[in-house]
Curated annotation (Swiss-Prot):
The lineage of its organism: Eukaryota, Viridiplantae, Streptophyta, Embryophyta, Tracheophyta. Keywords: Chloroplast, Membrane, NAD, NADP, Plastid, Plastoquinone, Quinone, Thylakoid, Translocase, Transmembrane, Transmembrane helix, Transport. One of its GO terms (cellular component) is chloroplast thylakoid membrane. It comes from Brachypodium distachyon. It is found in: Plastid, Chloroplast thylakoid membrane. It is a multi-pass membrane protein. This is NAD(P)H-quinone oxidoreductase subunit 6, chloroplastic. The gene is ndhG. One of its GO terms (molecular function) is quinone binding. PANTHER family: NAD(P)H-QUINONE OXIDOREDUCTASE SUBUNIT 6, CHLOROPLASTIC. The chain crosses the membrane at residues 10-30, 33-53, 60-80, 95-115, 152-172.
Length: 176
């Protein structure tokens, strides 16, 4: 969407705030149904970010795939689980939980301080991709591949790590 600057900034700040609240809801709510609905809110906010960035296809794909399929599947699976199992486990924090929280907070703060100080445009891969694209000897599919392997390398790797962690979590939950 081509919005005026102040309106665009207000929408980005509002969506970011709702995204943070939804993320906290996913983590902090003890009822898994409420947590799944918070995840749906987070995924809808991400889709709205894509709309603001004029990437309509990715926004609709985000809504259809993640909100429409995966989140509904999560809610469906949670409803099959016996509700009394969730309320029985009222353990307080253990040493392992505290250690894991400390490690996660340390990683988040180190990334928050490292990423803004890195000059991503000075990386050799991005200059190579511009030279290859300027030659015009490749088609659109190859250009997408080059951009995924060069310009969008960091987001692509972060998404793969998130998918790996979710796969490990799903396997762990299935074994129990």
């Amino acid at each position: 969407m081509d919005l005026p600057g102040p309106i665009h900034e207000i929408l980005v700040l509002f969506l970011g705030f709702v995204l943070l609240l939804g993320g906290l809801g996913v983590v902090l709510l003890t009822n898994p149904i409420y947590s799944a609905f918070s995840l749906g809110l987070v995924l809808v906010c991400i889709s709205l970010f894509y709309f603001l960035l004029n990437s309509y296809f990715v926004a609709v794909a985000q809504l259809l795939i993640y909100v429409g399929a995966i989140n509904v599947l999560i809610i469906f699976a949670v409803m099959f689980v016996n509700g009394s199992e969730w309320s029985k486990d009222k353990n307080s924090w253990t040493i392992g939980d505290g250690f894991t929280s400390l490690v996660c907070i340390t990683i988040v703060f180190s990334l928050m301080t490292t990423i803004p100080d890195t000059s991503w445009y000075g990386i050799l891969w991005t200059t190579r991709s511009n030279q290859i694209v300027e030659q015009g000897l490749i088609n659109n599919v190859q250009q997408i591949g080059i951009h995924l392997a060069t310009d969008f390398y960091l987001p692509f790797e972060l998404i793969s790590i998130i998918l790996l962690v979710s796969l490990i979590g799903a396997i762990t939950m299935a074994r129990q």
